[in-house]
Design a protein with these regions (language model features):
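Short hydrophobic beta-strand element within catalytic cores of glycosyltransferases
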Residues: 705-708, 718
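Nucleotide-activated donor-binding/catalytic signature segment of Leloir-type glycosyltransferases, i.e.
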Residues: 74-84, 472-475, 650-669
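Aromatic "clamp/platform" in nucleotide-sugar-dependent glycosyltransferases that forms part
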Residues: 688
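Acidic donor-binding loop at a coil-to-helix junction in glycosyltransferase catalytic cores
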Residues: 208-216
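Non-catalytic membrane-proximal stalk/linker segments that position and tether the catalytic domains
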Residues: 1-14, 256, 261, 265, ...
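A conserved mid-protein helix/loop that constitutes part of the nucleotide-sugar donor-binding site
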Residues: 29, 431-436, 614-628
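Glycosyltransferase donor-sugar binding loop
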Residues: 60-62, 451-457, 635-651, 665
C-alpha cells in the first residue's frame, strides 16, 4: 500500500470506487477514536461489497504537534481496512480549501462516490454501507446525509445530548428546501457522487466567509440536487468548545455566508414553499413519534432532564445519577432533591416505541454499544440513556423564509439595479429627495427597490413612488414586520440581496439606521458586489449630542463610493470637522417643484411657520417671544404635523400654542401651494440643525421673505436683507425676535418684490430638474 506524506502532483492515482476524505486540524487524541469508528464503517461496507475499492485521503491542515503525534499512532486503523491511504500535510488554514484539495485527489482516482469525514466524530457501524446502498438504489447523482444526529463534546461524551435530531430529506413532504434560508438543516459529513463534486466545490473562506458546509449544500440544492437521508445511519457529532476552525469562524461576526445562487430570486422563488403557519400545522403531524417545534415542552415529565452550568453538568437518569462532574456532594444532593422522581420502566417502554417508529432501531442500539467500547459515551448504561431521549425533527421553519420567498416572488424583482434604503416616509425634505432620485432613476430605465426599514405612517409620497415605472416600494410594516424580522435579520437579508441578485449595481442609503449598520458591519463584502452611495444633508446635533446618522457617517465614510448632499455648506462643514479631502462628497442641488408666486406684498403683520414639529425644528424659540410679538400686533400662523418618529419631541410647543392669543395652529398642509403665502409677510424657520430645507427653497422661489437659523447650506441661498435674514445664534429665541422685528422696522429698505424675484432666480438656477438629473447621472453612471 502506498501512502505519501506530502502532496505530489506527479502521483498517478489508481482507480478506486469510494474515497473517504478526512480533514484534520488540531483534533489531537480525538482522531484516535474517529479513525477506529471509520475503520468499522469500512469493514461493514466490505463485508457486503468485498470487491469495492476504498481509498482514504487525509489532509493535515496546519496541524499542531499533538495531532501529528496521534495521526502517526492512529493511521494503522485505516491502513488495515482500506485499499489505499494517502495523507498530505498542507497549510491552507481553511477547511474549504482542505476539503477541495482532497476532493481533487479523489477525482483523480476516478472514484464514483466521496464520503466527507471530520476527524473528531463517531459514526454508526453501517454508516458507510447504508450510504452506498441508498446511492445504488437512487441510480442518479446523490447527496446523502445521516438520518440521526446526537451531539456530544470533547470531554463529557453524550452528557451534552438533550435529544436525538432526526434529519429529513429536502424533498420530504414534511420538509422544504426554502427552510435552508434561515437555518442549516443538515450537517457537514456528506456522501456525494463524484460527478456533483466535479461541478460544485467548497467556496474558500479567504478570511471572508464562514459556514462552508452550509454553503455547499445550498449550492447543490440550487443546482437541482435533493438532499437524501440514509435510513438507520447515525453520527455522534462532537461540538468542540475551543480550538476548531468552526469555532474560530463562528466567533468572527464579520464573516458571512458566501454568495450562492440559492438566494437569487429566480432560484429561490422556484423552490417548493409553504408558509410558516402551514409548516407548523404539517410538523405537528410528526409529533408521534418525533417531536417538532418544542412540542415536548408540553410533556416535560416524559423525558430525561439535563442541567448545565459552569459548576456542574448533571444528567439524571430515573432515580440514578447517570453522569456527574460536580465536585461538591452538596450540589449533587441539591440537584437530585429538586427533581421529580421518574418511573424508569414506564419511560423506557414509552420512548422505545417512539424510537422504533422514528426509525431508531435495534441495530442502532447495537452500534452505540460498540461505539461505547471505542469511547465511553456515558458512565452507565449508554443504550438505556439513549432510550430516554426525545427525537426532534430538524424542520426549523421560520418566518424569515416566508419574507424572503415573498420578496423573491415579486414581479421582475430579479431585474433590480438599485437598492435604496430609507427609514420611513415622512413629509420632510429627505423623502422629497428620495422621490426625486427615484424619478431620475426611473426615467433612465433603472429598476429600483425602495425599502422602508422603520415603521411609518400613511404619506402622499407613497402614491407617487408606486406610480413611477420600474420602482417598487416596500414598507416595513407590510413586508418586513418587526414581529417576524428584527433589524439584524433584516441586515442579513439585505446582504444576501446585495450578494446574489444578478443585476444589482448600487446600494443607496438615505437616513436608514439599518442601512448604515449594514455598511458598517459588512462593507468589505458589499463593495465586492455594488457601489455604495449615501445621501446626507446636515450635521445633526441635539440636546443628547450627535444624532445617530451623523455619528455613524464618520464610521462608514471610508467605505462608501460617494456622499451626495444638497449644498456646498455641508461639504465644507464635514471637511472642516473631519479633515476629509471632500473628493467623495458631491453637492447636487435638488429641483424645486413649481410654486405659486406671492402676489400681495402689503404688510399684514402675519408671519408663518410651516414644517414638521420635532426636536430639530425649534418652534418654541418663536413662541417664547409671543408677548413681544403681540405688542407689535404680529400674528403667528403655524402649519404642519408632528414627526411621530422623533422620540425626543415632547409636543410641548404645540400645547403651548393653545395658550397663546397671537399664535394659531392652522393644521397640516400637503405641498407648498396649500399655504396662504399672500396672507403672510414671511416664513420663519427656527432650527437646531439643517441642510437646505425644501420649504425654504419653495418659499424663495415663491418670492416669500425667509428668516432662518444660520446653519448647514442655508447661507448659499439666503443673503441678509435681500431675500431673508440668517440668525447667527440659531438656538437663541431673542435672536429670532430681533430678526422678525428688523424685518418690520426696515421693510421699506429691503429689496422690492421684483428685485427680490430676480435675486432668487439667480441663486436658485441650479435647482432645476434637468441639471439635477445630469449630476445624478454622473454619480449613478449614465
Amino acid at each position: 500500500m502506498y501512502y505519501p506524506n506530502t502532496h505530489d502532483n506527479m502521483i498517478v492515482m489508481t482507480k478506486m470506487d469510494i474515497a473517504l476524505n478526512i480533514t484534520l486540524h488540531n483534533e489531537g487524541d480525538l482522531l484516535y477514536k474517529t479513525f477506529q469508528s471509520i475503520a468499522l464503517n469500512v469493514k461493514a461496507l466490505k463485508e457486503e461489497y468485498p470487491k469495492l475499492k476504498v481509498q482514504a485521503n487525509v489532509s493535515l491542515d496546519c496541524p499542531d504537534d499533538y495531532t501529528k503525534q496521534f495521526f502517526a499512532k492512529s493511521k494503522h486503523f485505516l491502513v488495515e481496512v482500506v485499499d489505499e491511504l494517502r495523507y498530505y500535510t498542507v497549510d491552507f488554514a481553511d477547511l474549504s480549501q482542505s476539503r477541495n484539495y482532497l476532493i481533487n485527489k479523489a477525482l483523480s482516482s476516478k472514484v464514483k462516490y466521496i464520503q466527507i469525514y471530520d476527524g473528531d466524530d463517531l459514526f454508526s457501524i453501517k454508516y458507510l454501507l447504508r450510504m452506498h446502498q441508498l446511492a445504488i438504489k437512487a441510480g442518479k447523482p446523490v447527496v446523502i446525509e445521516p438520518e440521526f444526529v446526537l451531539d456530544m463534546d470533547e470531554w463529557s461524551g453524550l452528557c451534552r445530548t438533550g435529544s436525538i435530531r432526526k434529519l429529513l430529506a429536502s424533498n420530504d413532504p414534511h420538509q422544504l428546501a426554502t427552510n435552508m434560508y434561515a437555518n442549516n438543516l443538515y450537517q457537514s459529513q456528506i456522501f456525494v457522487s463524484s460527478s456533483i463534486f466535479e461541478k460544485i466545490k467548497y467556496t474558500p473562506g479567504d478570511g471572508r466567509y464562514r459556514y462552508e458546509d452550509y454553503h455547499i449544500l445550498i449550492e447543490m440544492i440550487a443546482s437541482g440536487y435533493d438532499i437524501s437521508v440514509a435510513p438507520s445511519t447515525m453520527i455522534l457529532y462532537r461540538r468542540k468548545l475551543t480550538g476548531s476552525l468552526l469555532t474560530s469562524s463562528n466567533s468572527n461576526c464579520r464573516l458571512c455566508l458566501a454568495p450562492s445562487r440559492f438566494f437569487s430570486p429566480r432560484v429561490f422563488s422556484g423552490l417548493n414553499h409553504r408558509n410558516f403557519e402551514e409548516m407548523q400545522e404539517l410538523s405537528a403531524q410528526l409529533d408521534a413519534p418525533v417531536i417538532t417545534n418544542r412540542q415536548s415542552e408540553d410533556n416535560t415529565d416524559q423525558y430525561i432532564k439535563i442541567y448545565h452550568s459552569s459548576i456542574k453538568n448533571v444528567l439524571l437518569y430515573g432515580k440514578r445519577l447517570l453522569i456527574e462532574t460536580v465536585r461538591s456532594a452538596k450540589h449533587i444532593g441539591r440537584s437530585r432533591k429538586n427533581q421529580k422522581r421518574l418511573n424508569t420502566r414506564e419511560l423506557k417502554e414509552l420512548n422505545l416505541k417512539r424510537l422504533s417508529e422514528a426509525g431508531f432501531n435495534q441495530e442502532m442500539f447495537d452500534d452505540i454499544r460498540q461505539l461505547n467500547n471505542i469511547e465511553p459515551l456515558a458512565t452507565y448504561d449508554t443504550a438505556g440513556f439513549i432510550n430516554l431521549l426525545p427525537i426532534y425533527t430538524a424542520i426549523q421553519s421560520s418566518g424569515l423564509n416566508d419574507i424572503y420567498y415573498r420578496l423573491c416572488s415579486l414581479p421582475d424583482i430579479d431585474r433590480t439595479t438599485d437598492l435604496l434604503l430609507i427609514p420611513h416616509l415622512t413629509k420632510g425634505g429627505a423623502d422629497k429627495a428620495m422621490v426625486e432620485l427615484c424619478q431620475a432613476l426611473s426615467e433612465h430605465n433603472r429598476s429600483v427597490l425602495v425599502i422602508g426599514t422603520n415603521a411609518g405612517d400613511d404619506n402622499s409620497w407613497r402614491d407617487k413612488l408606486n406610480k413611477l415605472p420600474g420602482v417598487t416600494f416596500l414598507e416595513r410594516d407590510d413586508y418586513f414586520p418587526v414581529s417576524q424580522i428584527n433589524d439584524k435579520d433584516l441586515e442579513i437579508m439585505l446582504l444576501r440581496v446585495i450578494q446574489n441578485w444578478p443585476k444589482l449595481e448600487y446600494l443607496t442609503v438615505m437616513n436608514s439606521g439599518v442601512g448604515y449598520n449594514l455598511i458598517n458591519e459588512w462593507h468589505d463584502e458589499i463593495k465586492r458586489h455594488v457601489k455604495i452611495i449615501v445621501h446626507d444633508w446636515c450635521y445633526g446635533v441635539n440636546d443628547c449630542g450627535l444624532i445617530f446618522e451623523t455619528t455613524i457617517l464618520s464610521k462608514v465614510y471610508r467605505y462608501i463610493d460617494c456622499l451626495v448632499t444638497d449644498g456646498d455648506g455641508y461639504k465644507k462643514q464635514l471637511m472642516k470637522i473631519h479633515g476629509w479631502d471632500g473628493r467623495k462628497i458631491t453637492p447636487i442641488a435638488l429641483p424645486i417643484n413649481p410654486v405659486n408666486l406671492k402676489q400681495d406684498y402689503v404688510i399684514k403683520h402675519h408671519i408663518m411657520y410651516a414644517g414638521r414639529f420635532s426636536a430639530q425644528k425649534r418652534l418654541d424659540l418663536v413662541l417664547t417671544s409671543h408677548r413681544e410679538l403681540a405688542k407689535r400686533g404680529i400674528q403667528l400662523d403655524i402649519y404642519g404635523s408632528v414627526d411621530k418618529a422623533d422620540r425626543l419631541y415632547d409636543g410641548r410647543d404645540i400645547r403651548w400654542v393653545e395658550q397663546i392669543d397671537n399664535a394659531r395652529y392652522q393644521g397640516p398642509f400637503n405641498g407648498f401651494n396649500e399655504l396662504p403665502i399672500d396672507q403672510v409677510d414671511l416664513l420663519i424657520l427656527p432650527t437646531q440643525y439643517e441642510g437646505l430645507p425644501n420649504i425654504v427653497l419653495e418659499a424663495l422661489k415663491a418670492n416669500l421673505f425667509v428668516i432662518a437659523g444660520k446653519c448647514g447650506s442655508l447661507p448659499e441661498v439666503i443673503e441678509d436683507g435681500k431675500n431673508g435674514f440668517l440668525v447667527d445664534d440659531n438656538g437663541n429665541a431673542e435672536a429670532y425676535l430681533e430678526a422678525i422685528l428688523k424685518f418690520y422696522d426696515r421693510s421699506d429698505q429691503l429689496l422690492s418684490p421684483d428685485e427680490r424675484k430676480k435675486f432668487n432666480q439667480k441663486i436658485l438656477h441650479e435647482h432645476d430638474r434637468a441639471i439635477y438629473q445630469k449630476h445624478i447621472g454622473e454619480v449613478y453612471g449614465w
